[in-house]
Amino acid sequence: MSVIKMTDLDLAGKRVLIRADLNVPVKEGKVTSDARIRASLPTIEIALKQGARVMVTSHLGRPTEGEYNEEFSLLPVVDYLKEKLSSPVRLAKDYLDGVDVAEGELVVLENVRFNKGEKKDDEVLSKKYAALCDVFVMDAFGTAHRAQASTHGVGKFAPIACAGPLLSGELEALGKALSEPARPMVAIVGGSKVSTKLTVLDSLSKIADQLIVGGGIANTFVAAQGHNVGKSLYEADLIPEAKKLLETCDIPVPSDVRVASEFSETATATLKSVTAIKDEEQILDLGDVSAERLAEILKNAKTILWNGPVGVFEFPNFRKGTETIARAIAESDAFSIAGGGDTLAAIDLFGIADKISYISTGGGAFLEFVEGKKLPAVVMLEERAKQ
């Protein structure tokens, strides 16, 4: 994957526009989870230290496109950056016709979704973004799968388009895990529906030595083995697909589970064999035997790709399966890569972030990359590197 890297460029005195992923949760004007901003800080700091005229922009939330809405303003992000950086930081609301930036100053360009044509990758808007800079830095892996004006179009028209350190690191880590994995390679795919992850399961079944399924996805595989899954979340119409995958790939289907009579935080967890599930019960977590069996597999792995929890870990009574898996990954010597919102929440909950080799910042982009799809922003950077 050949792209120009920001770290290989001399940025002194240049107008540098960084497209970061600063789409963070905000409550009452304050950032409530700063993980994405923290991940973007090193890129901003490199450009500032080199004496560049730095602009950074992002989307935040889902405002009506083309309309200013204070609720989705990047102002809370600006306040956060002011606390973390020694350089001056300010917000620019109207910037499409040009913005003055001093060397060593950071100007945050207001939410790109306030601009008409952003999502449609409008050429006129893309050219306006491009005219703001000498160097465009794409550093938002989380939006690299979307062809939009601030992630894709701008890069076609900017004098130079390059990958920021966060995006470069993400592509290298995923490339390492998928193209030449150290073996055995184990992939974990959790989540509620097989339908949304079918392509991922299919792609991974071809490269993983073992494929661990969890959550609602695992319930469909339990049903595919002929067991009653009661009121559990599962997809009956995808049982043939699950059977096909069971024939072609080593998938350790749970042998015991934790069930409840209702989907609630206070529901009592009952441990039982998959052969004994009653009509009124629903599976909400793995059982101890199954979880330990998976932990053993993970301890012997050399590459682990983790996307999705294996149970309803948000409920304390149904957390044990995901925690057992998480701790096994943390203790493993494998190169481990984790991605997806629920997965990151589980990593935070169990405090194992420093034990995972690489944590991906992308949800949809992470899955599309794993599926083998081309990400529009990355394709654009590759094209520009050839010019």
From Swiss-Prot:
Q: Which residues bind ATP?
A: 197, 314, 340-343
* Pfam families per the UniProt record, alphabetical: PGK
Q: Which pathway is it part of?
A: Carbohydrate degradation; glycolysis; pyruvate from D-glyceraldehyde 3-phosphate: step 2/5
Catalysed reaction(s)? (2R)-3-phosphoglycerate + ATP = (2R)-3-phospho-glyceroyl phosphate + ADP
Keyword field: ATP-binding, Cytoplasm, Glycolysis, Kinase, Nucleotide-binding, Transferase
Q: What is its EC number?
A: 2.7.2.3
Q: Name one GO molecular function term.
A: phosphoglycerate kinase activity
GO BP terms: gluconeogenesis; glycolytic process
Question: Which positions are annotated as binding substrate?
Answer: 21-23, 36, 59-62, 113, 146
Which EC class heads this enzyme's classification?
transferase
Q: Name one GO cellular component term.
A: cytosol
Say which domain of life the source belongs to: Bacteria
Location (main, coarse): cytoplasm
Its localization reads: Cytoplasm
Q: List the disulfide bonds.
A: none
Assembly, per entry:
Monomer.
Looking up PANTHER family in the UniProt record yields: PHOSPHOGLYCERATE KINASE, PHOSPHOGLYCERATE KINASE 1, CHLOROPLASTIC-RELATED
Write out the similarity annotation: Belongs to the phosphoglycerate kinase family.
This protein's name: Phosphoglycerate kinase
**Taxonomically, what lineage is the organism?**
Bacteria, Pseudomonadati, Pseudomonadota, Gammaproteobacteria, Enterobacterales
